[in-house]
């Protein structure tokens, strides 16, 4: 990246320029580039103000600016950008710098630091200095692939949460049945352990790995509860054996609970 001396070179500026050069070699429609970044904006840490500024930048460009061999340069004045975003000058500069630092836009600086540009009769940019949106074109494939991965992980997380919910309800049903029928066994300790395990339930936006660990914890604990439950019913029964067996059958039916059976309730 060529620096004219008035802007201090940084690694982030260099990376942004590399993305801009890569974007110039591609032909990515403006709508595709903008849709790609919008779909993952929150996931990569962009704030609403960042997205608003990107929209203002994009609105200044034309479709032909995104063709191969060209760069979508934005030379809009600060006044124009402030009017379209509602930002103060300081806020505008701060978010523009952030977009550069994360490699979404680049600076194309004139020798005096002023933004300006010129189009020919066909509307193509002949010469321009300002904010360069070519990095968005360069990273469109990256962001589209990221969105696919994010959606797949979300589907996996939803499935794991349903499984955790089912296992949790099986455990609760057995503990409640044991308490109701005063079954012999370490039920007080198991109930206390279950309450502690519930405190380890993941919050929102947990990773697949965290949910897998949680499912393993609950599945292992379910085996302990089922073992205690089976031991209680393997001992000689009194005159209430038939009633106790009905309780066992009722709780065992909870194993047949399916995700569709609880889909209307909050999982985990």
What spans do the regions from the language model cover?
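Short recognition helix of helix-turn-helix/winged-helix DNA-binding domains
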Residues: 1-73, 125, 184, 188, ...
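N-terminal, well-ordered alpha-helical segments
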Residues: 51-55, 79, 97
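A short alpha-helical element within helix-turn-helix/winged-helix DNA-binding domains
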Residues: 68-86, 99
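Basic amphipathic alpha-helical segments that dock to polyanions
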Residues: 81, 92-105
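Electrostatic interaction modules used in gene-expression and signaling proteins
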Residues: 156, 172-268
